[in-house]
Amino acid sequence: VYTYDGGSAIFDGFGEIIDCCAPFTPELKFVDLDSGCRGRNAIPIPVAQGSDIGSAYSALNYGIRKFLAMIGMKRVVIGVSGGIDSAVSAALYGTVLDPGDLLLVSMPSMYTSRTTRDLAGKLARNLGCLYSVMPIQDAVEFTVGQISKTPVINMKTGKRQQLAVAPFVAENIQARD
């Protein structure tokens, strides 16, 4: 995510900030510079020192709002696994959207633990948003079947063989299917 924080500043001839705009806020500011003082008599303003986390949050919140507005999207669907990545994404979008415009979808299979299923539901309850559970085991089995039934042909010899799908590969299919 790329965001431009705003926070434009005006410096005097000695490098002191004499005025600045607020970060992550569209702002047009007119500043009257007294040419007689050449900036040195101006009173430097304190620059807000935010935390790295607070600044990162502001940047992400601003970026999400601007991106959604730019593409005209008012509602979002997020697949939630019960893990940290989807939880952070859902929490960020939860600060930008009304709860009725955010749908979290849990897509369990045989590889999904009870703990992660429960965490996905708890996340949706905590955010007060829409929630759905759509099991994907049938889709995973279909994809595994497609892979294992598709012949692989050695173009030199004409020999045909089948691909075997190992259990850890099937688990990765589940994550991407």
Kindly give the residue locations of the regions a language model identified:
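C-terminal beta-strand edge segments of enzyme domains
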Residues: V1-N61
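Structured core elements
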Residues: A9-I10, I17-I18, F30, V77-G79, ...
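Generic secondary-structure signature for well-ordered alpha-helical cores
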Residues: G13-E16, C20-P23, G36, N61-A69, ...
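A conserved beta-strand->alpha-helix junction
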Residues: T25-D32, D101-V169, R176
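Glycine- and acidic
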Residues: A42-S51, M73-I78, V105, R160-F168
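Conserved acidic
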Residues: A48-A56, T112, V169, Q174
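Phosphate/ATP-binding catalytic cores across multiple sugar-kinase/actin-like superfamilies
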Residues: D52-V77, D177
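ATP-dependent adenylation/pyrophosphate-handling site
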Residues: K74-V80, I84-G121
